[in-house]
Amino acid sequence: MVNSEEIADGFEPKPVSRSYSGDSSHDRSLSDLNHAAEDLSDKLKNVGLNEVTKEQSEKMMSVSESNGGLDSNAVVTINQEEEEEEEDRDGYGYGDGWSENESENVYPVRPGAEDCSFYMRTGSCKFGSSCKFNHPLARKFQIARDNKVREKEDDGGKLGLIDCKYYFRTGGCKYGETCRFNHTIPKSGLASAPELNFLGLPLRPGEVECPYYMRNGSCKYGAECKFNHPDPTTIGGTDSPSFRGNNGVSIGTFSPKATFQASSTSWSSPRHVNGTSPFIPVMLSQTHGVTSQNPEWNGYQASVYSSERGVFSPSTTYLMNNSSAETSMLLSQYRHQMPAEEFPERPDQPECSYYMKTGDCKFKFNCKYHHPKNRLPKLPPYALNDKGLPLRPDQNICTYYSRYGICKFGPACRFDHSVQPPYSTESSQAIVEPPQVSANGNESDGWN
């Protein structure tokens, strides 16, 4: 009898001693059976097909029957070994409900290794059977995929509870509906609209002051700006910003040292483009110091009260057209009303040349030079024209005055201002003659 384990492993079967008496024909049939078993094991190793196995088993059955049915157990053991080989192949990865077409592209299953991330995302792997990671079966892959989808949904739900800072700050979010954060405004959390200043900009006392508004007096964000926009009456800056409305129209400049009252607010006209205001003479009525509107007012005359400082400022025209007694009284009043801290005294610094010439300084309390208190506008020793500009026949003609009809240096200019400016109203007036009647009674316009 042949051992079944020896046939399955492909080793040569050893003859088994039998108790019954055998003849030479029995030994011959046993050797033939051993050769047939060896051939069958070789074919199973090389081919491994079920059909070949069945044919060989049928041959073995016929051989056993011809030999008197003594070795039928050996054929049964061969069939058992074939079934075990099929089970081994199924356990390697071809079983578990996979079809023959699916088994052609199976990736290696390595339970002890880490799952292939690319295979878990896409269901395929470019490395194929040479990949060193684990490739779970289809149902496991589907379970892992469902778990990841569930995790993403959970994460999205958590992010949806967080408010979108851009949506609540500006009232909109560039991501729109695709944003993962919350865009709903709770009814209980609706903030009241902030108060607006006279320019329509929000007042937010607890926030930082808008730097652009503090420099320019306007804000391009308007009511949606998150910074504070205080009224000009509460600003204490170091410079006089030029306030403009939201439409860009200039309203005026604000002086931080001016004295504001509840009934009126002092505003000054915007400065000249180059930083210095052109000289504008003024006219003063001798009754109670009230400004009188001259019928020949040409637009270059302004009030004697400086709206920027809120104090009385005498004009050169008034000083020239009045007596010395009235002039001294006016200057004493001007000295009394001018605030001491507007032009700082710095004895250790050189005197401000502009202040010493004109009695004024555009930098005011920010000027780093010395401004003596006893400095008053000196009476010019030369005559002035109708615009309050000096007449210096011994000097060259002021080119700025000859071109534009004004002079930004005023009475401190060192040149002559006796030339009639080209933009005079007298020279620009056209003489219109009445129509003349011709001899035939028709009117003529003078061109024919």
Swiss-Prot record:
One of its GO terms (cellular component) is nucleus. Keywords: DNA-binding, Metal-binding, Nucleus, Repeat, Zinc, Zinc-finger. Residues 63-79, 437-448 have a biased composition (Polar residues). Residues 1-106, 424-448 are annotated as: Disordered. It is found in: Nucleus. GO terms for molecular function: DNA binding; mRNA binding; zinc ion binding. InterPro entries: Plant_ZF_CCCH, Znf_CCCH, Znf_CCCH_sf. The keyword Nucleus applies. Residues 80-89 have a biased composition (Acidic residues). It holds the Pfam family zf-CCCH. A zinc finger (C3H1-type) spans 110-138, 158-186, 204-232, 346-374, 392-420. Its main location: nucleus. Residues 24-45 have a biased composition (Basic and acidic residues). The keyword Zinc applies. PANTHER family: PROTEIN PHOSPHATASE RELATED, ZINC FINGER CCCH DOMAIN-CONTAINING PROTEIN 43. This is Zinc finger CCCH domain-containing protein 43. It comes from Arabidopsis thaliana. The lineage of its organism: Eukaryota, Viridiplantae, Streptophyta, Embryophyta, Tracheophyta.
